[in-house]
């Protein structure tokens, strides 16, 4: 597995924060690093496989990656990221207690993926741009300024996370996308889902298309197919069982959609013919 080292990304040995844009981020094999990072998805779509679990990421997704996590990117489509790297929550010169603002693992569950709306994403970009402008300066005031900006970024992300920010349709759409991650196998009635998240059906279609580039049903099908591909690679369940588990009532229809999406059949993926290294 590829290991990324802080010496290759941080501007100096004393720097506690570094900015690493990926515009765009191509498919990238599984790796980990000796530093932590906050991945901010600017726009585009892709699959983020995090500690073996696949997540669909789009504009507004924020991922918190620790130094012992492993992850990869695949099936990217114009995926543009900004990575905010930091050595460790306790390696800041002027800040203490940052760990309390970061996601916390509870009973083996780590809430690694958050979502923010477009207006918050704009504020995030401004903070990141200010940090990036100061990267070449190593004096104490500049170091303190970068660390303060990092603290502001954490506060903004925490206050703007889905649990605390549902006042507009963009935030409700983000909550809907998070709900689909957990309920992708359910029979989805889009009228009922729109009502559940206080969106008109027209607004749901328009905003989801703007954010993901896909219609709601196309997005749901892709999400189901991504989950199915993960199970084909990492479980012993039959193709038919996996199809049903991922929300497809007809395994033949599932196989047709699967081949159309990935240019490989489910059996090809099961046998590793696509070249994926497990």
Swiss-Prot record:
Cell compartments where the protein resides: Cytoplasm
Domain of life of the source: Bacteria
Matching Gene3D superfamilies: Homeodomain-like, Jelly Rolls
GO MF annotation: an example: DNA-binding transcription factor activity
Positions bearing the site annotation: Interaction with sigma-70: 241, 250
UniProt key word Amino-acid biosynthesis: no
Pfam family, one: AraC_binding
DNA-binding region: 191-212, 239-262
Keyword match NADP: no
UniProt domain HTH araC/xylS-type: residue ranges: 174-272
A Gene Ontology BP annotation from the UniProt entry: rhamnose metabolic process
GO CC annotation terms, alphabetical: cytoplasm
Record keywords: Activator, Cytoplasm, DNA-binding, Repeat, Rhamnose metabolism, Transcription, Transcription regulation
Function per UniProt: Activates expression of the rhaBAD and rhaT operons.
PANTHER family assigned: HTH-TYPE TRANSCRIPTIONAL ACTIVATOR RHAS, HTH-TYPE TRANSCRIPTIONAL ACTIVATOR RHAS-RELATED
NCBIfam families in the record: PRK13503.1
Subunit organization: Binds DNA as a dimer.
Protein name: HTH-type transcriptional activator RhaS
Species per Swiss-Prot/TrEMBL record: Escherichia coli O157:H7
Gene name, Swiss-Prot/TrEMBL: rhaS
């Amino acid at each position: 597995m590829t290991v990324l080292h802080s010496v290759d990304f941080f501007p100096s040995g004393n720097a506690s924060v570094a900015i690493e844009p990926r515009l765009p981020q191509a498919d990238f094999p599984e790796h980990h690093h000796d530093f932590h990072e906050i991945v901010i998805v600017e726009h585009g779509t892709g699959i983020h496989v995090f500690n073996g679990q696949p997540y669909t990421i789009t504009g507004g997704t924020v991922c918190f990656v620790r130094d012992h996590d492993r992850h990869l990117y695949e099936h990217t489509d114009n995926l543009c990221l900004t990575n905010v790297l930091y050595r460790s929550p306790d390696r800041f010169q002027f800040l203490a207690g940052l760990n309390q603002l970061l996601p916390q693992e509870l009973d083996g569950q780590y809430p690694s993926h958050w979502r923010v709306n477009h207006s918050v994403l704009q504020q995030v970009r401004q903070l990141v741009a200010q940090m990036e402008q100061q990267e070449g300066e190593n004096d104490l005031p500049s170091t303190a300024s970068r660390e303060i900006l990092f603290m502001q970024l954490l506060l903004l992300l925490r206050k703007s996370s889905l649990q605390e920010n549902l006042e507009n349709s963009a935030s409700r759409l983000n909550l809907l996308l998070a709900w689909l991650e957990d309920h992708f196998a359910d029979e989805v009635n889009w009228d009922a889902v729109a009502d559940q998240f206080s969106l008109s059906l027209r607004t749901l279609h328009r905003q989801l298309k703007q954010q993901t580039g896909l219609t709601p049903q196309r997005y749901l099908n892709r999400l189901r197919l991504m989950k199915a591909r993960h199970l084909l690679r990492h479980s012993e369940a039959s193709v038919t069982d996996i199809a049903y588990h991922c929300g497809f009532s007809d395994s033949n229809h599932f196989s047709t959609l699967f081949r159309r999406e990935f240019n490989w059949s489910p059996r090809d993926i099961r046998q590793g013919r696509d070249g994926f290294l497990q």
